[in-house]
């Protein structure tokens, strides 16, 4: 896919039953150039719209020369966060050694699906919803008690608003 305003090709895949999250994480931390991919803990995502808002902001920041991180893939993780703390966003939205559901985002083309030992699933809102941890999302975005965990649309609106407004005062 592409956003109409930008030339970069964007590929997104959903993986379940991932067996090598620890290896992927180690490769990311070591700076292996083959791993220039945003690997996201799928349990922290609410919908495709939620992720695409962060991807759009990351690509927009890249085009404007205003990225806060080293590359556009880490910028996606940073943009998912609702605050200006890069490490906090990487920790909250990135994968851990025991992550079993991963969404991978590759911006700019290139192979990445062979890096993940898991089952590739369709990237759909239904697939995302199967594993979303609403309580975790509410905690990550520090949503007030007035936001109902039962109202997924309300949580999604609040989360997307937080990531879009990050950095504005």
Curated annotation (Swiss-Prot):
> Do you know which Pfam families this protein is assigned to?
CGI-121
User: Might you report a single GO cellular component term?
Assistant: chromosome, telomeric region
What is this protein's name?
A: EKC/KEOPS complex subunit CGI121
Annotated GO biological processes are: tRNA threonylcarbamoyladenosine modification
Q: Which organism is it from?
A: Yarrowia lipolytica (strain CLIB 122 / E 150) (Yeast)
NCBIfam families recorded for this chain? PRK14886.1-1 (NF011465)
Family label:
Belongs to the CGI121/TPRKB family.
Q: What does the annotation say about its assembly with partners?
A: Component of the EKC/KEOPS complex composed of at least BUD32, CGI121, GON7, KAE1 and PCC1; the whole complex dimerizes.
User: Which function does this protein serve?
Assistant: Component of the EKC/KEOPS complex that is required for the formation of a threonylcarbamoyl group on adenosine at position 37 (t(6)A37) in tRNAs that read codons beginning with adenine. The complex is probably involved in the transfer of the threonylcarbamoyl moiety of threonylcarbamoyl-AMP (TC-AMP) to the N6 group of A37. CGI121 acts as an allosteric effector that regulates the t(6)A activity of the complex. The EKC/KEOPS complex also promotes both telomere uncapping and telomere elongation. The complex is required for efficient recruitment of transcriptional coactivators.
Primary site of residence:
nucleus
Q: Which UniProt keywords apply?
A: Activator, Chromosome, Nucleus, Telomere, Transcription, Transcription regulation, tRNA processing
Location comes to:
Nucleus; Chromosome, Telomere
């Amino acid at each position: 896919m592409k956003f109409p305003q930008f030339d970069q090709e964007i590929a997104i895949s959903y993986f379940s039953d991932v067996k090598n999250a620890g290896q992927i994480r180690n490769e990311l931390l070591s700076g292996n150039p083959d791993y220039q991919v945003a690997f996201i803990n799928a349990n922290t995502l609410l919908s495709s719209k939620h992720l695409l808002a962060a991807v759009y902001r990351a690509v927009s920041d890249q085009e404007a020369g205003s990225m806060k991180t080293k590359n556009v893939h880490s910028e996606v993780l940073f943009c998912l966060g609702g605050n200006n703390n890069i490490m906090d966003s990487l920790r909250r939205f990135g994968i851990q050694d025991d992550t079993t559901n991963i969404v991978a985002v590759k911006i700019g083309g290139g192979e990445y699906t062979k890096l993940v030992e898991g089952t590739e699933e369709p990237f759909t809102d239904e697939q995302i919803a199967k594993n979303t941890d609403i309580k975790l999302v509410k905690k990550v975005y520090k949503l007030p008690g007035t936001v109902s965990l039962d109202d997924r649309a309300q949580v999604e609106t609040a989360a997307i608003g937080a990531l879009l407004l990050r950095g504005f005062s």
